């Protein structure tokens, strides 16, 4: 059996707990855990961890609009997408897995 801890974390991967409902249409729920890869370059359409203005880390779908702007989109119809200057965000990792623990 493979060591689950080694598979989930290490080599630039880390695990975060989801604390909102903004990605439910991507089947990522409040209380789930996401595995992010900090070494993977974000492509349009990827779900990412983005740091906004060096202040707030968010889980969003990423779209590069042009050389200066990106769109960060929730996967929940009740929230509008946000457009940012690339200077205002830093991609911290691309989501490569989602899991939950039974409660």
Which positions does each model-derived feature cover?
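Glycine- and charge-enriched low-complexity intrinsically disordered segments
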Residues: 64-103
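Exposed loop/turn and edge beta-strand positions of beta-sandwich/beta-sheet ligand-binding modules
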Residues: 12, 56, 89
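Well-ordered beta-strand positions in beta-sheet-rich domains
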Residues: 33, 59-61, 82-83
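Residues located in well-ordered beta-strands
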Residues: 17, 58-61, 94
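A short, contiguous structural element within a folded domain that forms the immediate neighborhood
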Residues: 1-51
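Short, compositionally biased
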Residues: 44-70
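Short acidic/polar capping segments at secondary-structure boundaries
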Residues: 40-41, 55, 77-78
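Short beta-strands and strand-coil junctions in structured, solvent-facing domains, enriched
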Residues: 24-25, 57, 102
